Amino acid sequence: MKMNKWTVGLAAAGVVSLASTAQAEENSVLTAMSSTVISGSVEASYNGSLGSGNQLAGHDNGFAANGASLAISSPLAGGDYSAAFNVELLLGQRAADFSGEGDDFHIKNANIGLNLPFGNGVDLTVGLFDTIVGYEVEASGSNPNVNRSYGYDLEPFTHTGLLASMSLSDGIDVSVGLANAFDSTAGLHNDDTTDFAYLAGVSITVPDSLGFLAGSTAFVGYTVGAGDDEDKLFYVGGSIASPIENVSLGVAYDDREYGNGDEADAVALYAVWGVSDGVSLGLRYDTLDGTDGDSTSMWTATLGYSIWENVLTRLELNNESGDRVNGSSNGLGLNLFYQF
């Protein structure tokens, strides 16, 4: 154990014991490490088609090593003025797809969390963090389906800045933030200006008193750059409990206004049925009104099942119509997502 000169001097004078000091420092390190969580995922897949060419996967039919993620974090502890951190890395094709730059390594998150004992408590996030809008996320295993919806590609992915989140009352949470750009993800949606972007969102959770709707959530979010030439995105989404056992519903709407005056909007409808223990069926229908004035639609059916521990295996069918460039297309995919 390395000690500073001040500690060594105190030990020589008999004020402290080197052994006890070393033990105290070791215990401090162990205490810090005990709250650190290491997690991540590894993804692999097979992409094919039924008859026509598969334009949905973005590459030729065949096997794919989608890549991996690795996260090291420490959650906010209870009590006032607590602190936390979060670092998340993407590797392989997942890094290339997310960053838009083709690199096999990408820093997705690098932020510090801070708690302020103000009102009901304010949680601050400083650094590089995920966007507050959107129904789907980068990790496919956390989504109802493997392939992303049209709306996902309209949204910003990450922001570098400051985000403040707090609960106004039971079931009502708000978030406001200031960031460097509409999207801080390298190679995607960056306007390359020094103007700030502003983030705002409100989440409402249905109380238990409303019967089968209890636990349903609705979120409204808005992200805008601080200039007339900046992009804007308005998002409304919700997860809805249904009266049918083991069936949940979802909806998402994205309206993207580009700095050059173009506009695109997307709507997605979701239904997930927990067929049995370890088996689920996820359905999605989504549409896109693109910047070129064309309308494109897609339906997706995803059968998920858990055979191996920590592995989500999913078989997915996609069918797209209305794409002027590629025409109608269908996809057949098998995806394995290991999470630790």
Feature names for model-found ranges:
Residues 99, 185-193, 225-227, 259-262, ...:
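Solvent-exposed loop segments that connect transmembrane elements
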Residues 258, 288-290, 308-310, 320-322:
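Short Gly/Pro-enriched loop/turn and capping motifs at secondary-structure junctions
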Residues 204, 305-307, 328-340:
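Outer-membrane beta-barrel "beta-signal"
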Residues 1-24:
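Gram-negative bacterial Sec-dependent N-terminal signal peptides
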Residues 25-184, 192-199, 203-210, 267-270, ...:
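Outer membrane beta-barrel
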Residues 198-292, 297-298:
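Detector for outer-membrane/organellar transmembrane beta-barrel domains
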Residues 6, 103-106, 194, 229-231, ...:
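Short glycine/proline-enriched turn or capping motifs at secondary-structure junctions
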Residues 300-317:
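C-terminal closing repeat unit and adjoining cap/tail of repeat-based domains
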